Amino acid sequence: MSSPAVGKSLPKPISISQVRQLLDQPAKLNTPEARRDKAMLELLYASGMRISELVSLNLGDVDTGGGYVRCFGKGHKERMIPIYERAARTVKEYIEEVRPKLAHKNDEVALFLNPRGERLTRQGFWQKLKEYVKSAGLNSQISPHTLRHSFATHMLSGGADLRSVQELLGHANISTTQIYTHLTTEHVRRTYEKSHPRAK
């Protein structure tokens, strides 16, 4: 398997425990915006979507009963992504209990809304994420894309095949997805050196 190109920086995922720590932050604030943010963070990590895809979602793009989200990636290419039950439930609760409090117009189709009842922007979500990263005491370099990197790395570490992860991420070329195999190989190497009696 080919190595990442020279000079190409590797994505920096965070650990599963750090993801959990981050996703737990909005629950500490009992506000409509915090409950929206919880749904967005869960969905981002559940799906591996790009932040631009997340904020572009409309109400009809999420099937919380079936556990799927439909998004449109680069080149307006559609893909259906399964999401875990907790994420589906969190989004369902947001749609039923929180979104009506944020929506000012009945004809607004955007899934995630700001306090003015308009579609939340990438910048708006990024600003909220920075606040949660800070309150969780995590690395300030964490961005929305970090959760996408973490999704891919954790899926491969958990046994997912490269082609499936490629489809979930919406990569046109598998070589783009292969960069994550380097990260999982590095993890295996560190585990080996830490665990093997003759490697210590």
PLM region descriptions:
Residues 1-200:
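Conserved catalytic core of the tyrosine transesterase superfamily
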